[in-house]
């Protein structure tokens, strides 16, 4: 996998918006949302808990956004977006009011798959995250590539090394 393609600089290109919240900020966030979004959130039983996601309707037909719960919005963490990257369909995403600098590596590693011994691997397209701080992308991609190599070695049977 080319990890350096999973995070791209945000140049205003089309992307699905991700709203990040946590349990303590959830009610305030929800109060600012339109009725259709509040109804969708309630129907999906989304409460802003860590690793919870909800698909939200948008004003235009065919468009949508995502609500994602993390442990603590104010303390960006490495793994905050990892499960989200694994759960979303392929596409391009942009974070609303959330600093992804600490979570870039987790976004990349959330898409790691070991397919070596699968007869029919289930391949999915990439989930690309757009970020405002492109200077950190290269280092996060190098760390993801190194971590994936270690994971590959751990997952490979000893007799095949």
Where in the sequence are the language-model features?
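N-terminal hydrophobic/helix-forming segments and targeting peptides
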Residues: 1-161
